Amino acid sequence: MRLEDLRPTPGSMKKRKRVGRGPGSGHGKTSGRGHKGQKARGTGKVHPWFEGGQTPLQRRLPKRGFKNINKKVYAVVNVKVLEEKFEANEEVTPAKLLERKIVKDMKDGIKILGDGELTKPLIVKAHAFSKSALEKIESVGGKAEVI
């Protein structure tokens, strides 16, 4: 084998497409764009949501509802999590919940929900409570304070 015998692997060197260079090139005259029409033009891009001139789907469907700018978004914590992570008579505050990574972030505060059972009394300070959570906290001798 000599240096002049070396050739690139078949299929690795793709020939450049030279458009508009006569009929013999296979891409002459219209350069592979067909005859006239939007896609034959210089900036003939058709957006994916274009439906050929008919009224698009997002305009055919009615507008519904709205976003309530005053909506409160609470980080939720269930009673069963408090049972696992806190000792009896311990104070549960939003700062402690963040510190122990029980909640990631508080947008408008913390809401305690009533899923699970509670067996030890806790002093829970949160921004909101569900009815079942309030009952469970107070039934075991704990206190629920809205802050």
Curated annotation (Swiss-Prot):
Gene3D superfamilies: 3.100.10.10. The keyword Ribonucleoprotein applies. It comes from the Bacteria. One of its GO terms (molecular function) is rRNA binding. Residues 1-57 are annotated as: Disordered. Part of the 50S ribosomal subunit. Binds to the 23S rRNA. Belongs to the universal ribosomal protein uL15 family. This is Large ribosomal subunit protein uL15. The lineage of its organism: Bacteria, Thermotogati, Thermotogota, Thermotogae, Thermotogales. The gene is rplO.
